[in-house]
Amino acid sequence: MSRIHDALKRAEQERATSMGTHVEPSFDQPELRNPELRNEVSTELPRETMPSMSSTSAATMPAMGSGLTYESLLTRCPQTEWTPDPRTMLFFGEDETRVGAEEFRTLRTRLYQIREKMPLKRLLVTSALPKEGKSFVAANLAQVLVRQHGRRALVIDADLRNPGMHRHFGAPQTPGLADYLLGECDEFAAIQRGPMENLFFLPAGRVVASAPELLSNGRLKLFLQRVEALFDWIILDTSPVIPVSDATLVANSCDGILMVVRSNATPSDLARRAREEFPDKLLLGVVLNGTSSAALARSKYYYGAAVSTQV
């Protein structure tokens, strides 16, 4: 039995034993259960080169800015005023010792360990059902990644049906990915930079009814090829897997997938069904979210098994 299967089974068992029991966290908590991963890994990795776009017809491209470099992003992308939600954003305030923050550092360490074995830059974060905390996990993961000196991250709200990432950041929703995929703006207009150094945000943009058509028209893949050399990590938050097919479309352009499972809530059969939508080689593991803050706070050295990886 795979370790991912074990993680899903444990989540179902916790759900069964706690029905009717109040869980007290004031905000979502990821529980990272892997005791041997306490030490940080900060291995320097070479930046990947941007693929050549010379063979791509200009007619297939959306509106694009010319001369795309990191320096051009700094000078031409709007620096917007963000008002991050203090209930869910763990790394924007002065106190970075809040319950849950260390679990994200552990997740960062695990991702770098996986990255030593396989190419890993474009990371998709999804869940089986709505309200499991995928956007919370994606937003805080992006923040903790840029906490390492010199690391750059772009977080993308690719949930075009029900965008919510902008609310975590307290950032404008438009223009964004949908507007870019429709050819109505270029990267410089759509990508935002806020107060946190090296962290960039591409919101979903306006809500559209044609999300599958936009996500599969090839423009998202071209966009990722165009910007990937500028960032160490690209985190994509997508629609949940069970209700719609959007996540499986976005997965075709990603290197790895994290599945968010909500403790005491996600039925194991639906979690397994969601897991089966993706190739084994892409699914990195499961993040168990929504665990009790009291349980984590009882021991500052407690680490559980929320990330179960196949690599």
Residues covered by each model-derived region:
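P-loop NTP-binding module
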Residues: 1-311
